[in-house]
Regions:
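Conserved alpha/beta-hydrolase "acid-adjacent" motif
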Residues: 257-265
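Short beta-strand/loop motif that positions the catalytic acidic residue
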Residues: 244, 250-253
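Primarily recognizes the serine-hydrolase "nucleophile elbow" in alpha/beta-hydrolase
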Residues: 150-214
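Mobile cap/lid helix-loop segments that gate and shape the active-site cleft of serine hydrolases
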Residues: 48-54, 205-240
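N-terminal cap/lid segment of alpha/beta-hydrolase-fold proteins
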Residues: 26-84
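C-terminal catalytic histidine-bearing segment of alpha/beta-hydrolase fold enzymes
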Residues: 251, 265-268, 272-321
Length: 321
């Protein structure tokens, strides 16, 4: 290994520094093909977008960086009734999935049911975009999400939110990214973030990245994580978890052949050995249903809300717990 590559890997382990070289891509993954796919996705999002409930206001495309993907949407109550205690609204900070190369903050599965359930109860929902493969490596995607978190906390008071009552949430690739940030809070705090309450990871298969990458897997994971074990370790929530990290809930599908619940259970045991709090919520739902059905009136939604309510008395009050 050259000195240059050794320095790069040390930087990744120390702080998830951006890669200077792109991760390997499949031969069919050209910039033109990727852009066409993203355009079709954006068109489908527009076609399927449901109207907002009348008591919800949306603030669209707030920037947290110069790139067009570095944007977030804010969903808040359209009429604000002051809390008798003077407390500001808790915030769910949602990160979409899409294999680290696709997805959008406005997809109905990402926001529709969550917004419809939580915003009328006085919980703000922030939905975040971030830069994607092949242009932006996963290490820098984590930096994007951390910067979005810091910016959202800094601006929260402007739209009625409480910077100290954020709950991180993500699905699939987004669940990996929020788990990684939650595992090592210093990553976001270096960018100006304040402490948050905890995280809900919706069906991530990448809690222990080295273990997953050493087993048979789809090529998309090679595109995202490459072949170097040092890079895997730097992006692995299991290996990056530090004592004192906020609590986490790992929701996992019992319907997937790759059995993400086994990884979630091992992750929870590891967190417990470090003195932390983590719980696993297995669900007989598909990978997509775990995201899309959160917010429906169901035992599943109530179980997630139970974890959220356990983090803070104001959150519990807003959720009616």
């Amino acid at each position: 290994m050259t000195l240059q590559r050794m320095a790069l890997f040390c930087a990744l382990v120390a702080g998830l520094a951006p890669l200077t070289q792109a991760q390997p891509l499949s031969r069919s993954d050209t910039p033109q093909a990727t852009e066409r796919l993203r355009t079709r996705l954006a068109e489908r999002v527009q076609e399927r977008r449901a109207p907002l409930p009348p008591d919800v206001q949306k603030i669209t495309d707030l920037p947290y960086g110069p790139d067009a993907r570095q944007r977030m949407d804010i969903y808040r109550p359209s009429t604000s009734t002051p809390d008798p205690s003077g407390a500001r609204a808790p915030v769910v900070f949602m990160v979409h999935g899409g294999g680290w190369r696709n997805g959008d903050k406005a997809m109905p599965s990402v926001v529709q049911n969550k917004v419809a359930r939580w915003v009328p109860r006085g919980v703000i929902v922030v939905s975040v975009n971030y830069r994607l493969l092949p242009d932006t490596p996963v290490s820098q995607q984590a930096q994007d999400v951390a910067q979005a978190l810091a910016t959202a906390q800094q601006q929260a008071a402007q739209w009625g939110g409480d910077a100290g009552r954020f709950i991180l949430m993500g699905h699939s690739a987004g669940a990996h990214l929020v788990s990684l940030i939650n595992a090592q809070p210093a990553l976001a705090q270096r960018l100006g973030a304040w402490p948050w309450l905890g995280a809900v990871a919706l069906d991530s298969a990448m809690l222990n990245v080295p273990q997953f990458m050493r087993a048979p897997h789809l090529p998309l994971y090679d595109d995202a994580f490459g072949t170097n074990p040092v890079y895997w370790h730097a992006l692995s929530p299991f290996h990056q978890w530090v004592s004192g990290a906020p609590p986490a809930q790992f929701v996992c599908s019992t319907e997937r052949p790759d059995q993400p619940c086994l990884q979630a259970q091992a992750m929870a045991r590891h967190v417990h050995t470090l003195g932390g709090r983590a719980e696993v919520l297995p669900q007989p739902l598909t990978h997509g249903e775990i995201n899309a059905e959160l917010g429906l009136d169901s035992d599943y939604t109530r179980a997630v809300e139970g974890f959220m309510a356990s983090l803070d008395a104001v959150v519990a009050q807003k959720l009616g717990r």
